[in-house]
Amino acid sequence: MNKPITASTYVRCLSLGLIRKLSDFIDPQEGWKKLAVAIKKPSGDDRYNQFHIRRFEALLQIGKSPTCELLFDWGTTNCTVGDLVDILVQNEFFAPASLLLPDAVPKNVNTLPSKVTVVAVQQKPKPLCGKDRTSVISDENPEQNYVLPDSSSPENTSLEFSDTRFHSFSFFELKDVTNNFDERPISVGGNKMGEGGFGVVYKGYVNNRTVAVKKLAAMVDISTEELKQQFDQEIKVMAKCQHENLVELLGFSSDGDDLCLVYVYMPNGSLLDRLSCLDGTPPLSWNMRCKIAQGAANGLSYLHENHHIHRDIKSANILLDEDFTAKISDFGLARASEKFAQTVMTSRIVGTTAYMAPEALRGEITPKSDIYSFGVVLLEIITGLPAVDEHREPQLLLDIKEEIEDEEKTIEDYVDRKMNDIDSTSIETMYSVASQCLHEKKNKRPDIKKVQQLLEEMTGS
């Protein structure tokens, strides 16, 4: 017979079946991230940093459960069921906590998930440690929520955006202008430009104008309901925010098999691609990099002035037009906040882990998290290195800050040598700005206006 589970039972001694049951509760809506950031070392420091969380996240791509792998890993430290239940209760995971120690759950709470919306998902892999999962759409800050209309009813096919300046395309039109969403890369004569967590981008031609068509598609662990929310949010933000340094949305389609967004085409791709010299493009000069940094800061400043937090600032989301003018893109995760100076909490942790501020990993939504992410982008601009590389030491680019502060290296050791117009003084200045943006404590980071000022002083513009 199996021994009864007590608070002193080691997590590593739990049966695989029980761990699978726990993962069924914790995997949806990335609850495992909340669990991971709550786990501490005996010293009180975080056990898991951004890189660890990114690795757990990557397990979804091969059909594994992050919760299972997290518990397997943490279990090697001789943590107990009592330790686990404490964290579960603190984060209001009452149902899985009651599976382990029913008496540890407060008597006045319901251990069944409340306000659950079960939604269909497309192409969702089956986790190797758990059953097929449904997404739980949680009731976040009610002032922040925007209720989507029922897109299945004919009168709501425009998703209530008929009063915006955007053109409503038919799905058939977009299929036609993208050669039936030709999946072949542009380099071999197809239309596919790239893909991300929320869809695939295709090159198309509308009235002799080149456009970029993003067809939203449920990737790993993203439900169709979340996809609709991304679509809705992107249009809402774009309707309110127009600026030289924000990408321009031309229209959308919501009448077909997939939701689509149509943008002005950016011929020079993303900052990420140009820094890596993708497809043999020449390296960006230092002067050009400074211009791009200032443009991106201007775009972010406009968003913050208009009470929007982007939540996914990264080099892949900074696009470049024919003049290499920076255009911030991808507003599907953006949040509007009337109480902009205050921190808002969310049960849904989103963003790209290698760029995420410590508080963002805890579910806080604050403009200072955008500042932190922008600090990582500035390091990419200086070094030409990607934000994360598992074959590099340090693997996370933001960790070079520690090496420089410990005087093991200087920023000169990391400067991208592909540039032929290196200016040591302005590089030091940009690194100083990046370092301030990357302060662990959000209140110690500069606001975007200060960042703008420092970058302008750097170039004398």
UniProtKB/Swiss-Prot annotation:
Where it mainly occurs, coarsely classed, is cytoplasm
**Catalytic activity, as annotated:** L-seryl-[protein] + ATP = O-phospho-L-seryl-[protein] + ADP + H(+); L-threonyl-[protein] + ATP = O-phospho-L-threonyl-[protein] + ADP + H(+)
Judged by the first EC level, this protein's enzyme class is transferase
The UniProt annotation places ATP binding at 193-201, 214, 314-317, 330
Q: Which GO terms describe its biological process?
A: cytokine-mediated signaling pathway; innate immune response; interleukin-1-mediated signaling pathway; interleukin-33-mediated signaling pathway; intracellular signal transduction; lipopolysaccharide-mediated signaling pathway; neutrophil mediated immunity; neutrophil migration
Annotated InterPro entries = DEATH-like_dom_sf (IPR011029), IRAK4 (IPR017428), IRAK4_Death (IPR037970), Kinase-like_dom_sf (IPR011009), Prot_kinase_dom (IPR000719)
Q: Where in the cell is it found?
A: Cytoplasm
Supply the EC number(s). Answer: 2.7.11.1
Q: How is it modified after translation?
A: Phosphorylated.
Q: Which Pfam families match?
A: Pkinase (PF00069)
What is one term from the GO cellular component aspect held by the record? Answer: plasma membrane
Query: Any idea which residues bear Phosphothreonine here?
Result: T343, T346
Post-translational modification Phosphoserine, affected residues: S347
Residues of the Protein kinase domain: 187-455
Annotated membrane-spanning segments are: none
According to the UniProt record, list the residues that bear N-acetylmethionine: M1
Q: Which GO terms describe its molecular function?
A: ATP binding; interleukin-1 receptor binding; magnesium ion binding; protein kinase binding; protein serine kinase activity; protein serine/threonine kinase activity
User: What binding partners and quaternary form does the record give?
Assistant: Associates with MYD88 and IRAK2 to form a ternary complex called the Myddosome. Once phosphorylated, IRAK4 dissociates from the receptor complex and then associates with the TNF receptor-associated factor 6 (TRAF6), IRAK1, and PELI1; this intermediate complex is required for subsequent NF-kappa-B activation. Direct binding of SMAD6 to PELI1 prevents complex formation and hence negatively regulates IL1R-TLR signaling and eventually NF-kappa-B-mediated gene expression. Interacts with IL1RL1. Interacts (when phosphorylated) with IRAK1. May interact (when phosphorylated) with IRAK3.
Identify this protein by name.
Answer: Interleukin-1 receptor-associated kinase 4
What lineage, starting at the top, does this entry show?
Eukaryota, Metazoa, Chordata, Craniata, Vertebrata
This chain is encoded by the gene named: IRAK4
